[in-house]
UniProtKB/Swiss-Prot annotation:
UniProt source species: Danio rerio (Zebrafish)
One Pfam family linked to the record: Uricase
Active site (UniProt): 18, 63, 258
GO cellular component: peroxisome
Subunit and partners: Homotetramer; dimer of dimers.
Activity regulation field: Competitively inhibited by xanthine.
Assigned keywords, A-Z: Oxidoreductase, Peroxisome, Purine metabolism
Role noted for this protein: Catalyzes the oxidation of uric acid to 5-hydroxyisourate, which is further processed to form (S)-allantoin.
Entry's localization field: Peroxisome
Gene that specifies this protein: uox
EC number(s) per entry: 1.7.3.3
Gene3D superfamilies: Urate Oxidase
Name of the protein this chain belongs to: Uricase
Transmembrane segments: none
Positions that bind urate: 63-64, 165, 182, 229-230, 256
Length: 298
C-alpha cells in the first residue's frame, strides 16, 4: 500500500481550544444584582505546527488553562456583554502569548430575565425565558482588528392571518394551491456582522430582535400583509441596516413551519379554518444574506 509523504501535503488550517466553558458572573450594585451566564468555545491558532509534525508540545497552551483563563477574565474584567467578553478573551491570548496568531471565541448566553411585577423589578430574582437565544462570535488575528458577529436563534413566532402565497411557478408535480390567507410560523435565526467594535452591543441586539418582530407582526391593531417569507425576510434586513449603522451584513434564516387545516368531513364535522395540524417536517427553508454596498458604508 502506498503511503503519503509529508512532502506532498500542506496544512490548510489548524486550531485547538476548549469548548463548553460555562460561567455565571454577578455584578452587585448594592442590593440590586445583575447576572450574565454564558457558554464559551475558545479556539487558538499558533505560529508553529510542531505539535502536529513532531509531537513537540512545548508551545501548546493547555486547554485546561484556556478554561481557567475564561473564568479568571470574568473575575478580572467582569462581563458587560457577551460580545465585549469575547473581545477580552481575544485580546488576552494575543497579548499574553507571542506565538498565538489567531483567536476565535463563540459564546451563547443563557436567557435569564429579571422578574418584574406591575413595573417593579426584583432586586435579585430571575426567570429562565428563552424567547430568543443570543449568541456572538469574535475572531481576531495578531495585529489585526477583531471581527464581531452577533446573533439570535430559536425565536419562534406565529401569526394566524395577514400572509399568503400566490402566483408561484407550477409544473406537473405541483399540487399546492394559491393561498390568499394562511398561517405563518417560523423559528428565526439571524446573524449579523458589525463594521466596528465600538458598539453598544446590548442595545444593538435588542434593536435587531425588535425589528424582526415588528416586520413579522406589523402594527398591533391590524398587522402587515406578507406575500411570501422571502419578502418579509428581505424587508426585515433592510430595516435593520437602516436603523443600526454599525451593522454591515446580516443573514436571516426563516424555516416555514407549516400548519394545515384538518379535514373532518369523515367524522361529520365542518372545520372552517379553526383546527389545524402542526407539522414539524418537511418544512420550507428560506434564507438570505445582504450587506451594504461600498458607497453605502459608514
Amino acid at each position: 500500500m502506498a503511503t503519503t509523504s509529508n512532502q506532498n501535503v500542506e496544512f490548510v488550517r489548524t486550531g485547538y481550544g476548549k469548548n463548553m466553558v460555562k460561567v455565571l458572573h454577578i455584578r452587585r450594585e448594592g442590593n440590586h444584582h445583575h447576572i450574565i451566564e454564558l457558554i464559551a468555545n475558545v479556539q487558538l491558532t499558533l505560529k508553529t505546527r510542531k505539535d502536529y509534525l513532531t509531537g513537540d508540545n512545548s508551545d501548546i497552551i493547555p486547554t485546561d488553562t484556556v478554561k481557567n483563563t475564561v473564568h479568571a477574565l470574568a473575575k478580572l474584567k467582569g462581563i458587560k456583554s457577551i460580545e465585549s467578553f469575547a473581545l477580552d478573551i481575544c485580546e488576552h491570548f494575543l497579548t499574553a502569548f507571542n506565538h498565538v496568531t489567531r483567536v476565535k471565541v463563540n459564546i451563547d448566553e443563557v436567557p435569564w430575565k429579571r422578574l418584574e411585577k406591575n413595573g417593579v423589578e426584583h432586586n435579585h430574582a430571575f426567570i429562565h425565558c428563552p424567547e430568543a437565544l443570543r449568541f456572538c462570535e469574535a475572531e481576531q488575528y495578531l495585529s489585526k482588528t477583531p471581527v464581531v458577529h452577533s446573533g439570535l436563534k430559536d425565536m419562534k413566532v406565529l401569526k394566524t392571518t395577514q400572509t399568503g402565497f400566490e402566483g408561484f411557478l407550477r409544473d406537473r408535480f405541483t399540487t399546492l394551491t394559491d393561498a390568499k390567507d394562511r398561517f405563518f410560523c417560523t423559528s428565526v435565526y439571524a446573524r449579523w456582522r458589525y463594521n466596528t467594535i465600538n458598539v453598544a452591543f446590548d442595545a444593538a441586539w435588542k434593536a435587531v430582535k425588535d425589528t424582526v418582530i415588528q416586520k413579522f407582526a406589523g402594527p398591533y391593531d391590524r398587522g402587515e400583509y406578507s406575500p411570501s417569507v422571502q419578502k418579509t425576510l428581505y424587508d426585515t434586513q433592510l430595516l435593520v441596516l437602516d436603523r443600526i449603522p454599525e451593522v454591515e451584513e446580516i443573514e436571516i434564516i426563516m424555516p416555514n413551519q407549516h400548519y394545515f387545516v384538518i379535514d373532518m368531513t369523515k367524522i361529520g364535522l365542518s372545520n372552517k379554518d379553526e383546527v389545524y395540524l402542526p407539522l414539524d417536517n418537511p418544512s420550507g427553508n428560506i434564507t438570505g444574506t445582504v450587506c451594504r454596498k461600498p458607497r453605502a458604508r459608514m
